[in-house]
């Protein structure tokens, strides 16, 4: 079981990050809300991970803290919610925002996330509220709900293409992803900024 990685970021391709630890490169899938907080390539990062084994693949999902990982683990216990959908949920809103939406029973906010229909949203609210009660103390601190920033880098057509590809990987249809990015695209925005703003606008 791989629960934590500490190493150098080799490559960032949202929502994937390649981290080298002891000469081995680990490909880690991260929610965009966590991805935004990563340092630049070439710098050291610490990522808390959850290892998922499937018949056709072995996947690592990464988070910036244990609380986000705990929420991910609880999400994938929900009927109809697999790792890919859980990743999309935590990319569309921060962990704290999701907790707030569940506690306030905001079905309307949840159905705006990719892959979440009304029935799934209602099931998430019912099941997750019960699980939150079983967790000791506050699951998240107020700081987890801060607006995150990403390093500014010149945007190009590649930045827009990367943003569209990331949104498709998170569950949006290609045409929908292109429309989302084109609405907020601007010359000075990095791919991470475009992804964050597109997801924010979708809510």
Curated annotation (Swiss-Prot):
Keywords on record: Cytoplasm, DNA damage, DNA recombination, DNA repair, DNA-binding, SOS response
Matching SUPFAM superfamilies: DNA helicase RuvA subunit, C-terminal domain, Nucleic acid-binding proteins, RuvA domain 2-like
GO terms, biological process: DNA recombination; DNA repair; SOS response
Compartments where located: Cytoplasm
CDD domains tied to this protein: UBA_RuvA_C (cd14332)
Sequence segments annotated as region (Flexible linker): 143-154
Domain notes per entry: Has three domains with a flexible linker between the domains II and III and assumes an 'L' shape. Domain III is highly mobile and contacts RuvB.
Family: Belongs to the RuvA family.
HAMAP family per UniProt: DNA_HJ_migration_RuvA
Complex formation: Homotetramer. Forms an RuvA(8)-RuvB(12)-Holliday junction (HJ) complex. HJ DNA is sandwiched between 2 RuvA tetramers; dsDNA enters through RuvA and exits via RuvB. An RuvB hexamer assembles on each DNA strand where it exits the tetramer. Each RuvB hexamer is contacted by two RuvA subunits (via domain III) on 2 adjacent RuvB subunits; this complex drives branch migration. In the full resolvosome a probable DNA-RuvA(4)-RuvB(12)-RuvC(2) complex forms which resolves the HJ.
Function: The RuvA-RuvB-RuvC complex processes Holliday junction (HJ) DNA during genetic recombination and DNA repair, while the RuvA-RuvB complex plays an important role in the rescue of blocked DNA replication forks via replication fork reversal (RFR). RuvA specifically binds to HJ cruciform DNA, conferring on it an open structure. The RuvB hexamer acts as an ATP-dependent pump, pulling dsDNA into and through the RuvAB complex. HJ branch migration allows RuvC to scan DNA until it finds its consensus sequence, where it cleaves and resolves the cruciform DNA.
Annotated protein name in UniProt: Holliday junction branch migration complex subunit RuvA
Gene behind this protein: ruvA
């Amino acid at each position: 079981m791989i629960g934590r990685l500490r190493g150098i970021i080799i490559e960032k391709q949202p929502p994937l990050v390649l981290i080298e630890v002891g000469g081995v490169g680990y490909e880690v899938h991260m929610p965009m809300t966590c991805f935004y907080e990563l340092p630049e390539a070439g710098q050291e990062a610490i990522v808390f991970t959850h290892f998922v084994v499937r018949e056709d693949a072995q996947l690592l999902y990464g988070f910036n803290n244990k609380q986000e990982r705990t929420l991910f683990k609880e999400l994938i216990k929900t009927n109809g919610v697999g790792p890919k959908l859980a990743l999309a949920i935590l990319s569309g809103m921060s962990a704290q925002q999701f907790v707030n939406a569940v506690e306030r029973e905001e079905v309307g906010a949840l159905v705006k996330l990719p892959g979440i229909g009304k029935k799934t949203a209602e099931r998430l609210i019912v099941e997750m509220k019960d699980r939150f009660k079983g967790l000791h103390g506050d699951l998240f601190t107020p700081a987890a709900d801060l607006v995150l920033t990403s390093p500014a880098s010149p945007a190009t057509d590649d930045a827009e293409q990367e943003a569209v590809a990331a949104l498709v990987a998170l569950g949006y249809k290609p045409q929908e992803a292109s429309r989302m990015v084109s609405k907020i695209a601007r010359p000075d925005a990095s791919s991470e900024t475009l992804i964050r703003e597109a997801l924010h606008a979708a809510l």
